[in-house]
Amino acid sequence: MATVMEFKATARPKSGKGAARAERRAGRVPGVIYGDNKPPLPISVEDKDLRLRIQAGRFLTTIFDVVLDGQKHRVIPRDYHLDPVKDFPVHVDFLRLGEGATIRISVPLHLKGLESAPGVKRGGTFNIVTHTVDLEAPADAIPQFIEADVSTLDIGVSLHLSDIALPKGVKSVSREDVTLVTIVPPSGFNEEAAAPGAAPAAAAAAPAAKAGAAKAPAAAAPAAKAGAAKAPAAPAAKKK
């Protein structure tokens, strides 16, 4: 479930590059609240506060109540821009969330059962195809992550998004069934040799092959004699 946190903001009476630079010199980051069929609302937030929330992780999947002049605006961050040289935030965008709103969002993928997977025990290696999953979820019930159990995967087997039970009200936005993870075989891996029971079967097949080879010439000999006996004698040549 989504956790709602408060974020204090101040209204920006002016817009434009000059006003934005003035906000940054004052230790604030310009931003905007938009969406829900309402006019954009220019704001600014404390630079230090914004940095801490970004560095804490999952910033773009966290719902906030932006407190502005005593009024709360339910929002979710949609984007933020960093200075290309000094790497500090220079702008932040918030999407206003109306009642009953649903949003599209990328959620981290967490895997469990990595060490107990049969494919790993046989020398295989996990290949994580994607680290995030694109979902559509209710704004008040955004999952912090999606968990996938890979404890039963064997070599050559893949886990897809359709194999996972998503939370109630959450669905995938991808048109295709997304491959999440596979187990790659080790170098020189022989599936038949590695299959359980392959060695006993091969051992049992060897004596049988030898016995068949020994019997083949014996069976061929009588057939050759019979062929010789049945062959008609060549007619004698007539004297002239």
Swiss-Prot record:
InterPro entries named among the record's database cross-references: Rbsml_bL25/Gln-tRNA_synth_N, Ribosomal_bL25/Gln-tRNA_synth, Ribosomal_bL25_b-dom, Ribosomal_bL25_C, Ribosomal_bL25_long, Ribosomal_L25_dom, Ribosomal_uL5_bac-type
GO molecular function: 5S rRNA binding; structural constituent of ribosome
Function of the molecule: This is one of the proteins that binds to the 5S RNA in the ribosome where it forms part of the central protuberance.
Keywords, alphabetical: Ribonucleoprotein, Ribosomal protein, RNA-binding, rRNA-binding
Name under which the protein is recorded: Large ribosomal subunit protein bL25
Region (Disordered) location: 1-24
Subunit comment: Part of the 50S ribosomal subunit; part of the 5S rRNA/L5/L18/L25 subcomplex. Contacts the 5S rRNA. Binds to the 5S rRNA independently of L5 and L18.
